[in-house]
Amino acid sequence: FLKKIDESELIEINNSIKNIYQDILISENIEDNVKSSILKYLLRLIESIDQYAITGSEAIIEVLENTVGHMYFNHEYKEFMSNTETGKNLLSKMGEVAKKVTCFTGILELANKGFELIENIKDFNN
């Protein structure tokens, strides 16, 4: 299910993620704890792209999963990613990256459905 990415696509993806990183780093409109989480995941993504020749797509997928999965554990992070233009753009970019490295589509849609299911289970148990 993993695809091989050519060098030009890797460079394009990496530059795009680095630009997002810089934009978030200088932003004054993001809470420090949320900014810290986002920057941490973006650095991991940049590193996994840099090491693609060694690790392949698997490391990139792992970072994407962790980035989206963190939304379940941190409410402020989830709110930022779900309800701000910057967060939505970041999720969209991560979806683009996921499509380039896998044959799967709709990873973010599946993640959102998973979050809804988890919330429904939590509500049901309360």
What label would you give each PLM region?
Residues L2-M81:
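Membrane-active, amphipathic/fusogenic segments and juxtamembrane/transmembrane anchors
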Residues N74-N126:
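Membrane-inserting effector segments that mediate pore formation, membrane fusion
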